[in-house]
């Protein structure tokens, strides 16, 4: 028998120019010594118990690694504070920044205009503030006092003893997490987790009223958004579920259900929160300026190291355009600088072909460019788009765009000081970002809320102490919105969010009727086989899965009583794809081909054609390729899932390849099979495929094989 190997991707050319395409993938070496490109997806999960208590030592491992860098940061801060000649230092710093080059200068895909914009916005120059009259400062705010019951005041002016206590518990690895759950719908619950400094501290669930009227908004926002009268009836059911976590400044991971309606609804709410936060921050500073004028010896701690306070991370320019447009709409400001430029660079009125699935058409509509960093500055009367990053209140970016600034190949040109004082971070459409390069998101978290390396005209007499003490991460609010919760999403919430106010996440109870296996539209044998991990750790899971594949699945392919050809092997992880491909090439005589997200058009076309003709018996197919292309692969008679798809829609789309073959008379549904390999760590994906109750049985039941039809 002639053996066919993979098509052209056996070796990765290390000499290629390191452009934007390379930055979308991560290189690492596996046991077979071959370079591997894959999204780096750590695994984590959170139990849904009514009340649980555990000590999360794993989440604190990074604390010890940061001790050395903290000492250096404090040293740099003391040097700045003791500087006798700040004018000379500032002139020298500006001279250096005039020579700053775009971090993406090695990327030949970026236009000169894009490079110039990034370069210009990184140069820290003194901003021109609008002169503020006394009437402007008090206009519309006569009924707005600094109320301690306002979450904005109570959260950011929290007693330092509470912050110091929790900070020390993190450092000493003595934190304790306590959780509780409330039901917000027949099939949806909200789970609240709070990190405490010790077991003796009391735990109680925060209030969940579901009313916007419970939270004070700036008067100009009420007027612009018709909220002067009743504010309760204006909220949708989805908004009532998340309004309290958002406006109480708690972290939130929310899994929504509808691509169009739900995204629009949660954006309406968080944009209102963003504007309220920015307006209150700026008004507080301006009022304190007046107080200082009459009382020069007064102490007013109301600032961070730098001006930017909000960071919104989005996958594409189209999503960013929708977000910024909503910010403009709800701001109550009529003057918007460079609005036409925003439309020219971010908006495209295009849609993918109607033959593609609805989710694909939504994800890839409009401008799908994933490189952008946009500064937005607010004054009393105007919004200034494309503002200098250090003079911006809001920064909207893609992971790739910010990565090229934070991780410049020239270490001297790297910058992250503009992220030092972020108090509100929002990740929109995490499900799409995960299919880009999720490691860029981890890079952003690593650079957040660090003590800046330079002064940036900071008035240290007004910097809050928890900034000076490098405790800003404990006050930062992080909001994450995703279509499907994955281990990556849980890892971000549990491992990267340390909000002293605690964190919320929702959980949907998937019924049998809502599961993927019930929505196929035809009957076919679906076999789920569990990999026994024993007492193995999460790190060892890929090895156990691979051994199961080579010892159980491969023999079933060679000795199958069903079809010998038309076998589609679906592999979600690119590292697993490389490993399986090498094994089939070196250790078996199976005729196979492979297509992945790095295959060129010619290879994609020829390999699919050979598979349809039966000249290739097995076709290796990656999840990222399916996400970006949604091919209609012909000639599929059986499907093997190396791991359950993270997106349940992918399960149905791939299995329906068999249904289309049966419709054309190329296969018999009584002979065709679908085989899915899973472990107990795949519970999140299994829930959406087989339902919540069945997933619990599959992951913890006595049997290791379950069949559906």
Curated annotation (Swiss-Prot):
Gene3D superfamilies to which the protein is assigned, alphabetical = P-loop containing nucleotide triphosphate hydrolases (3.40.50.300)
Top-rank taxon, per record: Eukaryota
- Keywords for this entry? Nucleus, Ribonucleoprotein, Ribosome biogenesis, rRNA processing
Q: State the residue spans of region: Disordered.
A: 1-156
Subcellular location, in the record's words? Nucleus, Nucleolus
- Gene Ontology cellular-component terms listed: nucleolus; small-subunit processome
One molecular function GO term is: rRNA binding
Q: Which Pfam families match?
A: Utp25_C (PF06862), UTP25_NTPase-like (PF22916)
* This protein's record includes keyword Nucleus: yes
- Bias (Acidic residues) occurs at 37-66, 105-116, 126-150
Might you name a Gene Ontology BP term for this protein?
A: maturation of SSU-rRNA from tricistronic rRNA transcript (SSU-rRNA, 5.8S rRNA, LSU-rRNA)
UniProt lists compositionally biased (Basic and acidic residues) regions at 22-36, 82-91
- What the protein does? DEAD-box RNA helicase-like protein required for pre-18S rRNA processing, specifically at sites A0, A1, and A2.
Family indicated by similarity: Belongs to the UTP25 family.
Describe, as the record does, how this protein assembles with itself and its partners: Component of the ribosomal small subunit (SSU) processome composed of at least 40 protein subunits and snoRNA U3.
Question: What protein name is recorded for this chain?
Answer: U3 small nucleolar RNA-associated protein 25
Species, as recorded: Zygosaccharomyces rouxii (strain ATCC 2623 / CBS 732 / NBRC 1130 / NCYC 568 / NRRL Y-229)
């Amino acid at each position: 028998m002639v053996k066919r190997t993979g098509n052209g991707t056996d070796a990765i050319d290390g000499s290629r120019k390191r452009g934007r395409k390379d930055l979308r993938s991560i290189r690492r070496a596996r046991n077979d010594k071959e370079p591997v490109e894959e999204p780096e997806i750590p695994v984590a999960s959170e139990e849904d118990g009514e009340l649980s208590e555990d000590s999360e030592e794993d989440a604190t491992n990074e604390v010890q690694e940061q001790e050395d860098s903290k000492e250096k940061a404090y040293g740099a801060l003391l040097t700045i504070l003791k500087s006798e000649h700040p004018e000379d230092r500032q002139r020298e710093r500006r001279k250096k920044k005039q020579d700053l080059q775009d971090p993406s200068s090695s990327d030949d895909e970026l236009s000169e205009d894009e490079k110039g914009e990034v370069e210009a916005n990184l140069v820290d120059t003194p901003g021109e503030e609008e002169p503020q009259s006394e009437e402007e400062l008090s206009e519309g705010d006569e009924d707005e006092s600094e109320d301690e019951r306002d979450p904005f005041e109570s959260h950011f002016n929290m007693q330092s003893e509470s912050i110091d206590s929790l900070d020390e518990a993190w450092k000493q690895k003595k934190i304790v997490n306590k959780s509780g759950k409330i039901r917000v719908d027949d099939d949806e619950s909200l789970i609240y987790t709070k990190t405490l400094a010790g077991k003796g501290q009391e735990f109680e669930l925060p209030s969940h009223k579901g009313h916007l009227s419970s939270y004070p908004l700036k008067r100009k926002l009420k007027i612009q958004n018709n909220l002067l009268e009743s504010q309760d009836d204006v909220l949708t059911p989805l908004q009532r579920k998340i309004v309290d976590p958002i406006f109480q400044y708690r972290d939130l991971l929310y899994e929504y259900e509808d691509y169009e309606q739900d995204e629009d609804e949660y954006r309406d709410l968080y944009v209102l929160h963003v504007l309220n936060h920015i307006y209150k921050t700026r008004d507080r500073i301006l009022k304190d300026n007046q107080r200082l004028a009459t009382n020069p010896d007064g102490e007013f701690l109301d600032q961070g190291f730098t001006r930017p306070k909000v960071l919104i991370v989005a996958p594409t320019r189209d999503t960013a355009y929708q977000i910024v447009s909503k910010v403009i709409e709800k701001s109550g400001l009529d003057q918007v600088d460079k609005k036409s430029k925003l439309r020219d660079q971010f908006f495209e009125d295009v849609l993918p072909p109607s033959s593609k699935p609805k989710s694909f058409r939504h994800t890839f509509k409009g401008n799908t460019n994933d490189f952008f960093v946009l500064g937005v500055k607010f004054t009393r009367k105007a919004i200034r788009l494309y503002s200098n990053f250090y003079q911006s209140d809001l920064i909207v970016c893609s992971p790739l765009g910010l990565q090229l600034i934070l991780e410049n190949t020239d270490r001297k040109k790297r910058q992250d000081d503009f992220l030092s004082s972020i108090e509100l971070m929002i990740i929109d459409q995490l499900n799409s970002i995960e299919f880009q390069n999720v490691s860029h998101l981890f890079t952003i978290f690593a650079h957040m809320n660090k003590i800046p390396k330079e002064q940036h005209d900071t008035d240290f007499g007004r910097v809050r102490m928890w900034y000076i003490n490098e405790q800003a991460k404990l006050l930062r609010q992080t909001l994450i919105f995703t279509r499907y919760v994955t281990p990556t999403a849980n890892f971000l919430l549990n491992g990267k969010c340390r909000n002293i106010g605690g964190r919320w996440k929702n959980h949907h109870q998937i019924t049998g009727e809502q599961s993927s296996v019930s929505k196929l539209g035809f009957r076919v044998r679906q076999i789920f086989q569990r990999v026994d991990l024993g007492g193995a750790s999460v790190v060892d899971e890929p090895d156990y899965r691979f051994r199961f594949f080579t010892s159980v699945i491969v023999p079933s392919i060679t000795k199958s009583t069903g079809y010998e050809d038309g076998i589609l092997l679906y592999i979600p992880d690119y590292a697993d794809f490389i490993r399986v491909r090498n094994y089939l090439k070196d250790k078996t005589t199976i005729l196979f081909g492979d297509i992945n997200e790095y295959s060129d058009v010619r290879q994609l076309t020829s390999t699919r054609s050979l598979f349809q003709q039966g000249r290739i018996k097995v076709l290796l197919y990656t999840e990222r390729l399916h996400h970006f292309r949604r091919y209609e692969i012909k000639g599929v008679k059986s499907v093997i899932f190396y791991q359950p798809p993270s997106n349940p829609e992918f399960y149905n789309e791939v299995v329906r390849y068999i249904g289309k073959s049966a419709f054309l008379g190329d296969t018999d549904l009584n002979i065709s099979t679908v085989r899915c390999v899973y472990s107990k760590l795949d519970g999140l994906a299994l829930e959406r495929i087989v339902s919540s109750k069945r997933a619990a049985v599959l992951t913890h039941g006595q049997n290791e094989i379950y069949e559906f039809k």
